[in-house]
Amino acid sequence: MTFVDIAPADQAAVEAMWASYVADSGYDGPLVTAFAFGDSAEMADELGLLVLHGPKRATAELVQAFAAQGEPLPRAGDRCVVLGGDGRPLAVVRTTDVRVGPLSSVDDRFAWDEGEGDRTRAWWLDAHTRFFSRQCTAMGLTFSHDIGVVFERFELAWPPTRT
């Protein structure tokens, strides 16, 4: 998102990945956006690889971050390209569920589905309190545990998993 210190999206590579996804899946809807997780190139790589190869099937973002970027909130069925820290595409994800609520409303299941750290709610709250505090500072907002958060679940849509 806007607060990520990564290279700009490699548009040609994003378009090539999207074309491969559309050709393979037959999907005829739009690509909503291309984005990176986190606020550094290293974090974007780490979290992107957790999507591609691991347990990450959820993410959270401040409601205010979408507003600041002029982007709509995600909706179930959206397709997005996940970028690495170098701006190159790693995967296509499909949003399966979206809930908006205060940061403090995160539950154990969501923390587990984010696939980060030890996957507990306590770890998740600590890590996201630090992350969202940095975002709030960058946006000129005051952080609180009641701040609005978009809790989004997704599935890996591309590349196809091989069994």
What name fits each language-model region?
Residues 1-92, 98-163:
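Mixed-charge, low-complexity intrinsically disordered regions
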